Amino acid sequence: MRSRLEEQVADLLDELDVDYEYECTKLNYFIEANYIPDFKVRDIYLEAKGFFKPSDRRKMLAVKKLHPELDIRFVFQAPYNKINKNSKTTYAMWAEKHGFPWCAYYAIPLNWLKP
């Protein structure tokens, strides 16, 4: 049991000789949210990132899963920063692993910006 209250409820069910299962079912749920890309250049969405929070990484994976047809690219302030202090993974490595093109803000490829 995960909490004292759950233990108390289980004890009550046991005392009443109620058949039950504990945490036997996993149910998916979704919290509806919106993503507003920073920039749109033609059909390319540019997401400018300084600090790349775990919640932002989860959000971007969710957006990519729901909209695989979109061309979303990262423009990192510091692409070689680690995603956290205990990781060897950099922002750039994370983007590559998940199929997002990326660049540093000071080196945006011109072919991203002009036809």
Question: Which residues fall in each region the model found?
Answer:
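Nucleic-acid endo/exonuclease domains
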Residues: M1-P115
